[in-house]
Amino acid sequence: MSSCALAAVLWTGCGSGEQKPQVSATDDFAVMTEALDKGAGAPDSLGFVWQTEQFADIKIIRYQVPGWEKLTPNQQALVYCLNQAGLSGRDIMWDQNNRYNLRIRALLEGIYQEFKGDKSTHGWHRFETYLKRVWFSNGIHHHYSSVKIQPEFTRAYFDFLLKETGLTASEELMSVIFDPKVEPKKVEQDASKGLVESSSINFYAPDVTTEEAIAYYESIADSSRTPVEIGLNSRLVKNAAGAIEEQPYRVGGLYGSALEKVVYWLGEAIQYAENPKQATALQNLIDYYRTGDLALWQLYNINWVKDTEGVVDYINGFVEVYNDPLGYTGSYESIVQIKDFDASARMEKLMANAQWFEDGMPILPQHRKKKVVGITYNVVNVAGEAGDASPSTPIGVNLPNSNWIRVVHGSKSVSLGNIVEAYDKAGGSGLLEEFANDAEEVRLAEAHGDLAGKLHTALHEVIGHASGMLEPGVAETKATLKEYSSTIEEGRADLVALYYMMDPKLVELGLMGSLDVGRAEYDSYIRNGMMLQLRRLEMGADIEEAHMRNRAWVSQWCFEKGQAAGVIVREVRDGKTYLDVRDYEALRGLFGQLLQEVQRIKSQGDYAAAKALVDGYGVKVDPKLHQEVLDRSAKLGIAPYGGFINPWMEATRDASGKITGVTLNYPDDFAGQMLRYSQDYHFLPNEN
């Protein structure tokens, strides 16, 4: 029995949708009668195990770092120092996600390490799974849905674990763990419930209201042509007089003890920098962390964008704002990456033709960039990740997020090649065959799906996010579109990619052999956006995550607008629902129409139109179809989410302390990794 199948007996299940557990939570002390299948995958032809285990709705994967041995000792040392810097800030992400997270992590890890009793019981397995889910999400809220993870063991069993280990927990902490009404949701996106008041994210003190936060940000809005990203690196609190003020993330300020370590390792990295531009950007980042000055963050981003010559690159900072219901504050993340020269060369034609793509977009002329500058795109191999990028990671990134910097100085886009490969190697079989409409759809996917996915990611990051412009006088999107800004931007980039996936220009450029690659991507996108991604939701839940919402509203809008012409047909055969794209060219036309409207929404800051589009097509779920998807998926035993164990690095030094080389190995124990991180990189107090 696979671990996911076993979970159907012990848990509410993989992505949910299975029946409630047959084994009652009241038998936490009963010994499990069936051997536990951890869900590890079979070794590949070289003996490497890509998937190490599966629990709840998660599979744990390993990735390799191709080309590591080709790096010079200096480049290896640079990677090592940048990775140490990233890991040194990991506690920040935990505390940002929720103010109780570090206390709960310490408590759970203490039990896990100190308990000497019977570990063959249902209760212990439930506790272990809960801890792993918390580790995976960097806190007590699901990493994707943002809903609080509810333990499947009873409070009585937890009291037993506390007694057996000599540990204690306050009633406040127990309520946070067990009461569904306490800290229920990390990010609330329903404005009627109070975006700030109902969000458990730790970007706002508990007594700060949505109205107060918005008023404060409006009072400090930067209306210059080069605005800083206000609120990016701070928590909003009330001072003794009751006025709103910021607690900046900086050395000597909030999260200072962890940022001191980050700064130390960034300083170490400078001595191994590949070129002066890289060293300058690193020094800018250090100065920013020391002061919290957002003007220095701008300077860092400008110099980071200009640093395109090295083999090693990185992302480090308070970057993406998806976790802020108001879209201002960035989550801490770190990715250290090595350029894949061969794969990058194949995609250089996208960069070279960026202006052609911009000029050909079906958007209003006033929303097109007249001159596209500084787009850099590389396929990279990740060497290490931390914070918001780990264990669950993106597969593509486009930065910086500042609109004016992108227009004036350009942007960097990367596809995380070895992460995509690891997902593919660990991917379970059966979903395509179960949900594809017919044999031809399966054939297209098997023949072209891999390339289609990579091209979509490249177009999304390189052309999509870098495209378009705001109308004069329109504020940054987070201020105009507010809680809808993230999903609108992700959907806009998807629509750019989808529109061009069926363009003969890609065949002409040699990026794909035929338009069958585009057809495979259209099939996949509609299948996922309208059906398959629903396996990630618990029955009765709304769609919450920005990317899931955008896939839904893009797909559902096109389905509705093309329904009369039969562009996409929904059929039921033998009680199963299937989606069939009948007219790919017409669907491309619909993607183009929607792209024009979405670009207009962004360029003009049309909040009402954004709300109507997202709420109308991207939030609610057909319960009958949802249950069907859950039932069909459950039989396959494939976890809907994946995340990673990072490689471990050991540095060797000469007598002077200079790093002379770094060895890389690939651990296969997720729990071991997380405990090691807590031991070696716990640089914050548990309350901040």
Residue ranges and their predicted role:
Residues 10-13:
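C-terminal motif of bacterial Sec signal peptides marking the signal peptidase cleavage site
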Residues 15-18:
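Bacterial signal peptide processing site
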Residues 41-107:
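N-terminal-proximal low-complexity accessory segments that begin disordered
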Residues 72, 275, 486-503:
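An active-site-proximal "capping" alpha-helix that borders the catalytic cofactor pocket
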Residues 93, 498-601:
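Long, well-structured alpha-helical subdomains associated
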Residues 126-238, 242-442, 449:
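Contiguous, non-catalytic segments that form substrate-binding/exosite surfaces or channel walls
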Residues 215, 583-688:
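Extended, compositionally biased alpha-helical segments that mediate assembly or anchoring
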Residues 468-491:
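Post-HEXXH active-site segment of zinc metalloproteases
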